[in-house]
Structures are given as C-alpha cells and as structure tokens.
C-alpha cells in the first residue's frame, strides 16, 4: 500500500472512531439541554439513508467519482453518520488502490476498531437488505387482523431486518407510509426479565409522548413509551419495563443493530416523523422477530371467525346470564392480581347496572399474535342500548383447544 493510501485509510477510520468517541462521551456524561437542538436544520425522515443508498447504487455502477461527490456532501451535512463516513473513507482510499471490503483499512487499525467496524458492516448489510427485500405490494403484517377507525396509524417492527414500518389506516385499509432502520437490545429480542438487555416481542400500544425537555440528550428528540409488560407478558411471568421508541444523542446519527438496553432506537429525523404522526393510546406497535406479510383478503376468514366469537360474548353479556357469560372466561383469568372468582363481583356489578339492556360494540379492532400460544388483543367501545357512549375496553383472548377464552379484561378509556 502506498504511503498516501495508508494516510487516507487512517484518516477515514480516525473520522469514524472520533464520531464513536463523541457518541460515547455524550452517553456517559451528564448533558445539559442544548439550545442548538431547536436551531438545527430540518432534515426529512429517511433522507440520509436514501442518499447513502444512492451512493451504494453509484458504486455498483462503477461511477466512483459521482459516488465520492455524493458521499462527501452526505458526511458534510451529517458528520455524525458513522456508516456514511466509513463509505466516504473507502471511496477516498479506492482512488489509489482496490478495496477488499467495506471499511478496508490497514489490519492494525482494523484490529483496534474491530467491534465498531463489525457493527457498521452489519448496519450496512441491513440497510441494503431492506432496500432489496421490500414488502410485497398490497400486503400487511399478519397481526393486523382488523383495525378500527380509532387506530389511525399502526407500527410494525421486524427485528430480523432492523426495520420499523409506519402505516396509515384509512377506511380500514392500511397504507405503508414509511420504513426506517432501527436498533434493538444488545442481547437481541424476546425480553423475559428486567435487565436482560433484550427487546420484547408482542403486541403493544404507545402509552405517552415524553417531552424531550424532560429527557437526557441520550434519548434524542423524544420518546414514545409502550405498554410492556402487557397482560400476556404478565401471564408468562415476564418482568422489566421502561421500553421506549426513542432517538439518538447529538453525536450519533444511528446506532448499531444491537446496541440498546431493550428499547427501539431510530435516527432523530425518523423518530420526529413518527412522533408527529401517531396518536397516544390508540396506535398499536407490533414487535416481531420476522414479520409475515399477507394480503388483507387472506386474513378475512380468521377475522370473521373471531368476530362470531366476540358477538357471542356480547350476546351473553346482554342476556345478563352470569353462567353463560362466565363460560367465555379462562379458569386462570387474572386482573392485576385478582383471579376470576375475585373479579366476578365487578362483572356482576356491570350486569346489574345494565339492567338487561342490549349492548353494541363499536370501533372494534383485533390484533392476532402467535408464538407458543395463539392470542388475540381486542379493543372496543361497549355502548349500552340508549346510551351515546360507553367505556373503551381491552380484552386478551387465548385459544384453548378449539375455543377462545378471555384471560384479561379491563377498561382503558
């Protein structure tokens, strides 16, 4: 290798490592709220990634000069984008020698930054994979069996692809608005206990929108907590909490694919788009190992079958026949520590207040989750006959043999 090439390669890795050091310092040190945050130029969500992928495309077409120019512009505008810095450095080095791999720096330098290089290569591969393996047109994640008009938006996360998908629900039809690169737990997925550094799998809902002024800079432009552990998690003895969708510190554009304590982390421009878009309490968040994309028509039979079960429950409740109604509840039903026998008086009180009036279920949504068991998360408004409104309830159903049984029921609004 020529002295000139060596200097360029060293310069590249120094750039990348310096960004990493800045990120580490931003993480470890107590941070004051930066006034510059509100003065930063507006960056469109997904823009930086799209520009990086364009650089990749130009490289693939052997248009090195154009790729170098675009990479230089990208790192000038986003100096904290470590992966872009690495690609830019490779393009500089390629002017004097052929490259062997992404992050092609001298062996001694590569050894000292081995973990960082490995993380950046993984991030690069996942971003390219997301471009190449797009969801088939007209498909949705299989978990979205039926959404109501109250669910104006929905989020689905595919951890195997390090990807978050943002949907808009219009007239019962889901439209994919955008998708973004994400980071998950250092130890991967399937959270079980507090402190295991894993991201949970399941069906959740956005519970709040935390004011960025109340957060450390480490969390970026904001945070959207979700309701982990949900009743299904609690049923299986899962512990922990504080799982958020949040941004990155100022010194870091994005994080390694597995870099969090269990949260889902996005680039700040991407998170800002999500924060501006989704609604609190009504936005479902599906976190899966791998999403199964299906046509809406293919899930209609399952939706209709479950709708029949739910209507049978409604009819039983309207009948005020306690024995008939309790047949829909699992023997191991649990409501925040109360078993079925302890919770039954509350159900009896509801029947007494209804005085035999019929009830209607409005704004019904079904979210289907399958792992070692088959579950359904159901949300609806329960409106007594003659009333204009009623409580919003959420039920968790479990398939037991050939029947669906309720193992949790609560009022959420």
Give the label of every model feature segment.
Residues 150, 346-394:
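Surface-exposed, charged secondary-structure patches
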Residues 208-311:
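Exported/periplasmic cell-wall-interacting domains
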């Amino acid at each position: 290798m020529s002295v000139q090439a060596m200097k360029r390669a060293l310069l590249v890795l120094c750039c990348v490592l310096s960004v990493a050091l800045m990120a580490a310092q931003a993480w470890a040190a107590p941070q004051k709220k930066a006034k510059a945050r509100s003065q930063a130029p507006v960056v469109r969500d997904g823009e930086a990634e799209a520009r990086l992928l364009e650089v990749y495309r130009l490289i693939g077409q052997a248009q090195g000069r154009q790729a170098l120019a675009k990479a230089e512009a990208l790192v000038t505008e986003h100096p904290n984008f470590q992966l872009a810095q690495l690609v830019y450095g490779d393009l500089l080095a390629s002017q004097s020698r052929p490259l062997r791999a992404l992050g092609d720096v001298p062996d001694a330098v590569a050894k000292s930054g081995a973990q960082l290089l490995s993380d950046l290569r993984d991030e690069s591969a996942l971003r390219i994979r997301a471009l190449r393996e797009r969801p088939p047109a007209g498909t949705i994640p299989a978990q979205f069996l039926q959404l109501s008009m109250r669910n104006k938006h929905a989020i689905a996360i595919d951890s195997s692809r390090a990807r978050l998908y943002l949907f808009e629900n219009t007239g019962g039809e889901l439209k994919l608005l955008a998708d973004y690169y994400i980071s998950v737990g250092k130890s991967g997925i399937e959270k079980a206990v507090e402190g295991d550094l894993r991201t949970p799998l399941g069906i959740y809902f956005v519970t709040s929108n935390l004011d960025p002024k109340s957060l450390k800079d480490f969390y970026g432009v904001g945070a959207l907590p979700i309701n982990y552990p949900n009743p299904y998690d609690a049923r299986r003895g899962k512990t922990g909490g504080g799982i958020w969708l949040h941004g990155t510190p100022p010194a870091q554009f994005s994080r390694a694919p597995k870099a969090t304590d269990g949260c889902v982390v996005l680039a700040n421009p991407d998170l800002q788009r999500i924060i501006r878009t989704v609604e609190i309490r009504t936005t479902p968040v599906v976190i899966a190992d791998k999403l199964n994309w299906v046509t809406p028509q293919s899930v209609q039979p399952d939706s209709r079958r479950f709708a029949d079960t739910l209507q049978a429950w409604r009819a039983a409740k309207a009948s005020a026949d306690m024995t008939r109604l309790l047949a829909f509840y699992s023997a191991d039903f649990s409501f925040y520590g109360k078993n079925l026998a302890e919770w039954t008086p509350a159900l009896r009180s509801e029947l007494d207040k209804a005085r035999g009036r019929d009830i209607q279920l409005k704004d019904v949504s079904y979210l289907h989750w399958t792992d070692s068991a088959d579950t359904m998360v159901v949300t609806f408004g329960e409106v007594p006959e003659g009333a204009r409104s009623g409580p919003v309830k959420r039920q968790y159903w479990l398939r037991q043999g050939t029947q669906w049984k309720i193992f949790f029921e609560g009022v959420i609004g």
